[in-house]
Amino acid sequence: MEIRKENVDVVIVGGGPAGLAAAVRLYEQGIRDILILERETHLGGILRQCIHDGFGLTRFKTTLSGPEYAQRFIDQVKELGIPYVTDTTVLEVSRGKVVTAVSSGGLVQWQAKAVILTMGCRERTRGALGIPGERPTGVFTAGVAQAYMNLYNRMPAK
């Protein structure tokens, strides 16, 4: 398999609120060669499932729900023309700032001058943490339960 190779000034790993804010701030500081890499299909990260309000008071001077707050940043990224790639999983970031990722288009390596890691929080299962035991059917992490209710309008385990 051939690996496509590209150069970019800054690679931002993670298209959630921190990654989007970092991209916008870099652009405001005059840095234009930026690339956001996001594992999920949509930008916005955890904010997409935080339907309560209370976001945005500091940055946007108004209270917003999580999806509204994320959309403000997404709109800024699009308006500024900052490139992003979704459905892309970063496999490795080398000491030499080479970011290797895979997507449906295959393997890509970006040689960056700087890499910003903004992967946010991600719940890990008991097994991923190496805690022995069994997990009964119908037991969900808080994040999974929240996603079922707020993103998919379904009650967990129904």
PLM feature spans:
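Beta1-alpha1 glycine-rich phosphate/pyrophosphate-binding loop at the start
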Residues: 8-68, 157-158
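FAD-binding core/adjacent interface of flavoenzyme oxidoreductases
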Residues: 1-13, 71-157
